[in-house]
Curated annotation (Swiss-Prot):
CDD domains, per the entry: cytochrome_b_C (cd00290), Cytochrome_b_N (cd00284)
Keywords from the UniProt entry: Electron transport, Heme, Iron, Membrane, Metal-binding, Mitochondrion, Mitochondrion inner membrane, Respiratory chain, Transmembrane, Transmembrane helix, Transport, Ubiquinone
List of residues binding heme b b562: H83, H182
Main location: mitochondrion
Lineage of the species this protein comes from: Eukaryota, Metazoa, Chordata, Craniata, Vertebrata
GO CC annotation: mitochondrial inner membrane; respiratory chain complex III
Record localization: Mitochondrion inner membrane
Name of this chain's protein: Cytochrome b
Membrane-protein topology: Multi-pass membrane protein
Taxonomic source organism: Galago moholi (South African galago)
Length: 379
């Protein structure tokens, strides 16, 4: 058995990635989220495949086909809610994974970090297009509002929006192409995740201390396979609790109303995992400025490695940076809350303040605090 594992070309690859992989002996539970993201992706692909068997991507039947899945298909309701809430779990793991990378300085692995940013954008695009498919009120108006943002691009904006729509409004052509893209993108995400892992295994994992762990490595199996299994059980427990007890907790009631282009919902808002970016978008009165701020709020991650002025890699021994980090987390929670509120005072002011604080912490305060800590440590 050992010989097959170490000699067969395919088994050898799996062995080097998941069995005999040398891993740092001190990585904490924050390192579980990479494998949990893999699990989430598998859940989404499997449930999505079964949903696609019964879904109809036509404007006249899309809403009815989702209703049919929930009412008439065997266990269709659980497949549908696993898929919808699986997306929420996916983003919880994704944000935690990025947060871990920021806290412990994993962004110094440049290729891995940059592939991760591409993955984030791809997952966000996939989730957005998936939200349009049930063709409820929020699906239709969410698609209209978000795609319309591209019209802010000078000269070519309007043409670009109509090209994406496949007409002069969000209609049958839009729904059909969104379904096609929503189906193919998860497989592209899986391929990107493999490239992400490939680059990670070139350098080896980071660890909480941020210093090289070459002198103290342990095999991935059985130590971290068991640890990842525990994480997977807890994730599945949370997901099934959500699906079986309150499946609509994170959804919008407006999406149970079939799409009607003649009736605008009072508050158009995306799913909760996009609310922080939506709040930043709304906090700027100018359309182009808002779109630039929205893109910058995520693209700013690409600047993090270049803004890292600290001599120490991890924040583990840097209390001032830790304070700023948790302020940033609190700020993102505030933005998420504001994104779901109506556009009126005091929410407008809170949103604008939180948006300024977000960019201020990342672009100015963090690098300055790093330099101050270097000085305090006489480095």
């Amino acid at each position: 058995m050992t010989n097959i594992r170490k000699q067969h070309p395919l088994a050898k690859m799996i062995n080097h990635s998941f069995i005999d992989l040398p891993a740092p002996s001190n990585i904490s539970s924050w390192w579980n989220f990479g494998s949990l993201l893999g699990l989430c992706l598998m859940i989404q692909i499997i449930t999505g495949l079964f949903l696609a068997m019964h879904y109809s991507s036509d404007t006249s039947t899309a809403f009815s086909s989702v209703t049919h899945i929930c009412r008439d298909v065997n266990y269709g309701w659980i497949i549908r809610y696993l898929h919808a809430n699986g997306a929420s779990m996916f983003f919880i793991c994704l944000f935690t994974h990025i947060g871990r990378g920021l806290y412990y300085g994993s962004f110094t692995f440049l290729e891995t970090w940059n592939i991760g940013i591409i993955l984030l954008f791809t997952v966000m695009a996939t989730a957005f297009m998936g939200y349009v498919l049930p063709w409820g009120q929020m699906s239709f108006w969410g698609a209209t509002v978000i795609t319309n943002l591209l019209s802010a691009i000078p000269y070519m904006g309007t043409g670009l929006v109509e090209w994406i729509w496949g007409g002069f409004s969000v209609d049958k052509a839009t729904l059909t192409r969104f379904f096609a893209f929503h189906f193919i993108l998860p497989f592209i995400i899986a391929a990107l995740a493999m490239i992400h892992l490939l680059f990670l295994h070139e350098t080896g994992s980071n660890n909480p201390s941020g210093i090289s762990s070459d002198s103290d490595k342990i095999p991935f199996h059985p130590y971290y396979t068991i640890k990842d299994l525990l994480g997977a059980i807890l994730l599945l427990l949370s997901l099934f609790s959500l699906v079986l007890f309150s499946p609509d907790l994170l959804g919008d009631p407006d999406n149970y109303i079939p799409a009607n282009p003649l009736n605008t919902p009072p508050h158009i808002k995306p799913e909760w995992y996009f609310l922080f970016a939506y709040a930043i978008l709304r906090s700027i009165p100018n359309k182009l400025g808002g779109v630039l701020a929205l893109v910058s709020s995520i693209l700013i991650l690409a600047l993090i490695p270049y803004l890292h002025t600290a001599k120490q890699r991890s924040m583990m021994f840097r209390p001032l940076s830790q304070c700023l980090y948790w302020m940033l987390v609190a700020d993102l929670f505030t933005l998420t809350w504001i994104g779901g509120q109506p556009v009126e005072n005091p929410f407008i002011t809170i949103g604008q303040t939180a948006s300024i604080i977000y960019f201020l912490i990342v672009l100015i305060l963090m690098p300055l605090t790093n330099l101050l800590e270097n000085k305090l440590l006489k480095w």
